[in-house]
Amino acid sequence: MTVAADALSAPLRAGAEALGLDLSEAHLGQLLEFLALLQKWNQVYNLTAVRDPQEMLTHHLLDSLAAVAPLQRHLRGMQDLPGSAGDGAKLRLLDVGSGGGLPGVVFAICCPALDVSCVDTVAKKAAFIQQAAVSLRLRNLRGIHARVENLAGPFDVVSCRAFASLPDFVAWSQAAIAANGVWLAMKGRDPSDEITGLPPIAEVFHVEQLAVPGLDAERCIVWMRPRKGAEAGADGVGGPALP
């Protein structure tokens, strides 16, 4: 472990505890390894504009960890839901525009029973995800170099963080979401204007406020689901309509 990682261990542990996360030593170690890997690759591939390790911890790692408990809560209720991609099997998450693996890699570390695919249109970013999967020994993680519009599902959760407007996010990923799946969009301020502009194929069922340890900024998750009775195709979502 690098000196920088040693210095970040205590604030990472404290931040995870503040978020109510019961992470094992192995998970904490993987998160620190991921942060070190992100720093290393960022020197060459410009994965993120944030360079300072402490800022990376707060603005990226803890920011992503803030969504883990809400995600885990939803996964518990989805495992045996008819029409889900899981339906008794491993649930699947697609992280759109994953960039440097945020939050996709964090989700894969903290939710080992979840199958995580990170898609990005930039080849070097997808390659970084693949390297992270190998380096961190994450069999439930893979990077995909593609446009999300070209991916077929079904995925139980389709997530994004600082990716695009909600209407574009929903429109581009609609073919990938399971009939009883959810969209998890990590946002800053409550995006009321974007919510108003959502296409009829999706409905918001919860805007969940987040508090990120050490970060004085507004954060929230906009939870959405396919609207009941929506049809597949250009004006609907992939998969069968909800019952």
Swiss-Prot record:
PANTHER family: S-ADENOSYL-L-METHIONINE-DEPENDENT METHYLTRANSFERASES SUPERFAMILY PROTEIN. It comes from Paracidovorax citrulli (strain AAC00-1) (Acidovorax citrulli). GO terms for cellular component: cytosol. It comes from the Bacteria. It is found in: Cytoplasm. Pfam families: GidB. Belongs to the methyltransferase superfamily. RNA methyltransferase RsmG family. GO terms for molecular function: rRNA (guanine-N7-)-methyltransferase activity. It is an enzyme of class 2 (transferase). Specifically methylates the N7 position of guanine in position 527 of 16S rRNA. S-adenosyl-L-methionine binds at residues 97, 102, 148-149, 161. Keywords: Cytoplasm, Methyltransferase, rRNA processing, S-adenosyl-L-methionine, Transferase. This is Ribosomal RNA small subunit methyltransferase G. The keyword S-adenosyl-L-methionine applies. Disulfide bonds: none annotated. Gene3D superfamilies: Vaccinia Virus protein VP39.
